[in-house]
């Protein structure tokens, strides 16, 4: 569960929201108030923090926090 908490902290900081709002079901645009630029910057911050590359075609499929957690779990470098 530590991975979720790390991701949660990055998202909360990047989007300037309270960490309690960052739940697996929370959608970046609808629930967390992100715009398209916020999402791009968030993806870049997550790539840097977790050592993963999130291609544009994958990034377009990432709608909520749970999507990010699953992608990073599946692709994080050991």
UniProtKB/Swiss-Prot annotation:
<keyword id="KW-0276">Fatty acid metabolism</keyword>
<dbReference type="GO" id="GO:0031177">
    <property type="term" value="F:phosphopantetheine binding"/>
</dbReference>
<dbReference type="GO" id="GO:0000035">
    <property type="term" value="F:acyl binding"/>
</dbReference>
<dbReference type="GO" id="GO:0000036">
    <property type="term" value="F:acyl carrier activity"/>
</dbReference>
<dbReference type="InterPro" id="IPR036736">
    <property type="entry name" value="ACP-like_sf"/>
</dbReference>
<dbReference type="InterPro" id="IPR020806">
    <property type="entry name" value="PKS_PP-bd"/>
</dbReference>
<comment type="function">
    <text>Carrier of the growing fatty acid chain in fatty acid biosynthesis.</text>
</comment>
<dbReference type="GO" id="GO:0005829">
    <property type="term" value="C:cytosol"/>
</dbReference>
<protein>
    <recommendedName>
        <fullName>Acyl carrier protein</fullName>
    </recommendedName>
</protein>
<comment type="pathway">
    <text>Lipid metabolism; fatty acid biosynthesis.</text>
</comment>
<feature type="domain" description="Carrier">
    <location>
        <begin position="1"/>
        <end position="76"/>
    </location>
</feature>
<keyword id="KW-0597">Phosphoprotein</keyword>
<dbReference type="GO" id="GO:0016020">
    <property type="term" value="C:membrane"/>
</dbReference>
<keyword id="KW-0444">Lipid biosynthesis</keyword>
<keyword id="KW-0275">Fatty acid biosynthesis</keyword>
<dbReference type="Pfam" id="PF00550">
    <property type="entry name" value="PP-binding"/>
</dbReference>
<dbReference type="GO" id="GO:0009245">
    <property type="term" value="P:lipid A biosynthetic process"/>
</dbReference>
<comment type="similarity">
    <text>Belongs to the acyl carrier protein (ACP) family.</text>
</comment>
<keyword id="KW-0443">Lipid metabolism</keyword>
<feature type="modified residue" description="O-(pantetheine 4'-phosphoryl)serine">
    <location>
        <position position="36"/>
    </location>
</feature>
<dbReference type="InterPro" id="IPR006162">
    <property type="entry name" value="Ppantetheine_attach_site"/>
</dbReference>
<keyword id="KW-0963">Cytoplasm</keyword>
<dbReference type="InterPro" id="IPR003231">
    <property type="entry name" value="ACP"/>
</dbReference>
<dbReference type="InterPro" id="IPR009081">
    <property type="entry name" value="PP-bd_ACP"/>
</dbReference>
<keyword id="KW-0596">Phosphopantetheine</keyword>
């Amino acid at each position: 569960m530590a991975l979720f908490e790390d991701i949660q902290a990055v998202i909360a900081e990047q989007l300037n929201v309270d960490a309690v709002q960052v739940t697996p079901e929370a959608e970046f645009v609808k629930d967390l108030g992100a715009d398209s630029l916020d999402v791009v910057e968030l993806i870049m911050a997550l790539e840097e923090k977790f050592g993963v590359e999130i291609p544009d075609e994958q990034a377009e499929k990432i709608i909520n926090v749970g999507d990010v957690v699953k992608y990073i779990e599946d692709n994080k470098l050991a």
